[in-house]
Design a protein with these regions (language model features):
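A generic secondary-structure signal
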Residues: 31-32, 119-122, 145
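Active-site neighborhoods of divalent-metal-dependent phosphate/nucleic-acid chemistry enzymes
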Residues: 79-127, 133-137
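Short, well-structured N-terminal submotif of metal-dependent ribonuclease cores
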Residues: 1-71
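Acidic, PIN/NYN-like endoribonuclease modules and their adjacent C-terminal/linker elements
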Residues: 1-5, 10, 22, 43-44, ...
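Low-complexity, serine/threonine/proline-enriched polar segments
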Residues: 64-88
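Short, conserved catalytic or adaptor-binding loops enriched in Gly and charged residues
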Residues: 32-35, 71-77, 146-152
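A short acidic, often aromatic-flanked loop/helix-cap motif at beta-alpha or helix-coil junctions
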Residues: 49-51, 87-93, 160-169
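A generic local structural motif
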Residues: 27-29, 114-116, 144
Length: 169
C-alpha cells in the first residue's frame, strides 16, 4: 500500500496568476510538480466561491476574464482538484476561521483569507501557496498554537517567489 500523496492548497491569487501566465507562478508550480509529482493539489470551497464571484463581479474586465480562464483551467482537471464540499460541518470551519481572526493572525476584515487558511488546515494540506500578503504574514508559531486547539496542524504558507528562490537549482 502506497503512501498518501502530499496535499497542497492554492488560493485564489495563485489561480488568477496561473490564468494570467505569471512566469514566477508557473515556475513555482512546475518546480513543485517536478519535486512532488504525486502531490494532490486542492482548491477549497472558499477559493471556488471567490473565483465565482470574481468571474461575475470582479472590479475590472481583465480580472473577470482571468477568473473565467482560471475556472476553465480547473475544469480541465489536469493539476488541481476542486473540493466542492468538505467533510466538516461549516460551523466548525467558521469556528476555526473566527479564532484565526480573533487572535489577529489575519485582520478582522479578511474573513475570506481566514476561511482559506482554516480549510487548508482541515484538509491537512502541507503547503498553502499564495501571494496574498495577509496569508503570507501569518505568524506560524501562533497559528500552530491556535490550530492545535482544534487538533489541526498548520500548512506551511509560502509565495511562489519563495518556492523558486529556495528550491530552484
Amino acid at each position: 500500500m502506497g503512501a498518501t500523496p502530499l496535499r497542497l492548497a492554492g488560493d485564489t491569487n495563485l489561480l488568477l496568476d496561473l490564468a494570467d501566465g505569471d512566469e514566477e507562478v508557473l515556475d513555482a508550480v512546475a518546480l513543485i510538480d517536478q519535486r512532488l509529482p504525486q502531490a494532490d493539489w486542492l482548491v477549497s470551497p472558499s477559493v471556488l466561491d471567490e473565483l465565482a464571484f470574481l468571474t461575475e463581479s470582479g472590479d475590472t474586465l481583465p480580472l473577470r476574464q482571468s477568473a473565467s480562464v482560471a475556472f476553465r483551467q480547473l475544469r480541465s482537471g489536469r493539476r488541481f482538484r476542486a473540493m466542492l464540499d468538505l467533510p466538516f460541518p461549516s460551523n466548525f470551519i467558521e469556528q476555526v476561521a473566527d479564532e484565526i481572526r480573533q487572535r489577529e493572525l489575519i485582520p478582522a476584515g479578511e474573513v475570506h483569507d481566514s476561511w482559506v487558511l482554516a480549510e487548508a488546515a482541515l484538509l491537512q494540506c502541507a503547503l498553502l501557496l499564495t501571494s496574498d500578503a495577509h496569508l503570507r504574514g501569518v505568524d506560524h508559531e501562533l497559528l500552530t498554537l491556535v490550530l492545535n486547539q482544534f487538533d489541526l496542524a498548520p500548512p506551511v504558507i509560502a509565495t511562489p517567489r519563495e518556492i523558486v528562490r529556495k528550491f530552484f537549482r
